[in-house]
């Protein structure tokens, strides 16, 4: 079920820069680098190794404690698990995936038809496994 809300953000400045521009689909990259550290909690430990095939949405990193799982954003082959530059200026362990452009979705990704019968604990487990973090960037 999709939720909607009233309002939104309505910036007044600089709309003229994009108003007449067409929306362009951004092509998927040939290679993705997925950092195992994506929030202020503990970094994930990789669950995949060089040469492994991964599917889109497959969990590729996880760990105990204050850690949110990380998932593959493409399907393809793991080229490396190595330290790479991170946007925060550090170097972090990352999973490098060669995109196969098949967009094969992992069987781990499945819709949940009815959430109303689940306990709060079950919902929290589902949210955590999805890698969802709060505004504080800590897993919920």
Question: Which positions does each model-derived feature cover?
Answer:
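Aromatic/His-enriched, Gly/Pro-containing loop or helix-boundary segments
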Residues: 42-47, 64, 106-112
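Short hydrophobic beta/alpha edge segments that flank linear recognition/processing sites
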Residues: 54-67, 82, 93-99
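Short histidine-centered loop motifs in beta-beta connectors
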Residues: 44-53, 57
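Small beta-strand-rich domains/subdomains or short beta-sheet motifs embedded
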Residues: 69-73
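Acidic low-complexity segments
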Residues: 87-135
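Conserved small/polar residues in nucleotide/adenosyl-binding loops
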Residues: 138-140
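N-terminal, Lys/Arg-enriched amphipathic/low-complexity engagement segments
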Residues: 1-43, 47
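Conserved hydrophobic positions within beta-strands
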Residues: 76-78
């Amino acid at each position: 079920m999709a939720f909607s809300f009233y309002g939104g953000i309505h910036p007044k400045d600089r709309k003229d820069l994009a108003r007449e521009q067409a929306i362009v689909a951004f092509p998927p990259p040939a290679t993705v680098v997925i950092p195992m550290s994506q929030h202020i909690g503990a970094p994930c430990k990789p669950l995949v190794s060089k040469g492994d095939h991964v599917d889109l949405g497959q969990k590729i990193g996880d760990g105990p404690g204050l850690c949110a799982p990380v998932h593959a954003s493409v399907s393809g082959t793991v080229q490396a698990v190595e330290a790479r530059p991170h946007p925060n200026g550090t170097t972090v362990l990352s999973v490098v995936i060669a995109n196969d452009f098949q967009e094969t979705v992992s069987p781990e990704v499945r819709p949940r038809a009815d959430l109303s019968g689940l306990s709060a604990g079950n919902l929290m487990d589902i949210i955590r496994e999805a890698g969802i973090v709060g505004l504080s960037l800590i897993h919920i």
